[in-house]
Amino acid sequence: MPAAPTPDAIAETVLSALTGVRQIAPVTAAAPGFDLPAAYRVADAVRRQREARGERVVGRKIGFTNRTIWDEYGVHAPMWGYVYDTTLRSADHLGRPLPIGHLVEPRIEPEIMFGIGAVPHKDMDDDELMACMAWVAHGFEIVQSLFPGWKFRAADTVAAFGLHGALAVGRPTPITPATAADWIERLVGFDVTLLRNGLEMDHGNSVHVLGGGPLSAVRHLLHVLAEDPDALPLAVGEVVSTGTLTRALPVAPGETWSTRLEDVPLPGMTLALTR
């Protein structure tokens, strides 16, 4: 029986697929015993290989925090992946279309993002945790699937960059000691409408994010990171995207996607896509 591929070998395979803009069979198809601990070891190998070729970690994406989509994908718990300087687009660069031609089976997710202003810890309460957030913003993550038809197991998603393709962050709103308590309340239970070329495509509510809103996703991430000796701890200056507020919908070059937010003091966002 051949030896199971090493984390570095699997990392090379998924990075080759990423660079070649092609899809591959899920890791679990050839290795049914490939589990989440093994997948996060691959994720660490991917990070090291991406850093070796000049990319820099600038944040994290948390996926599958929206419980309403779990059955659709057969994944029933959150996962996370790194965000890189090559995949992040800040508000200062949102005036031009976002290229997606290098992504495979891309889908769009409206999300809430936080900027880390002080190092948070997993045992903090909501007040302490929000005090570590420098800003909050609304934006889009473009996710992708190296696996045809979006068919995979949870471990496959972790090995393949957490399905991350690109992160477009809207204009940040500072969180201050005077506004932190209000943000805790306002980020739970607000509504979002997702539109394609002006037509409503889906609706969501922030309470779908782990039942407690975006801050709950950050807390979950902190608990997972604390249990993983290979994972980099969250650092000041990182961006954390907390998971989709609606279903993840397929996108194509030439489309313009936008959102309307209600009951939260954040603007909607418009994002044009190009090849």
Regions found by a protein language model. Give the residues of each.
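Conserved metal-binding segment of the jelly-roll/cupin
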Residues: 234-246, 251
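Conserved, well-ordered active-site substructure
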Residues: 253-263
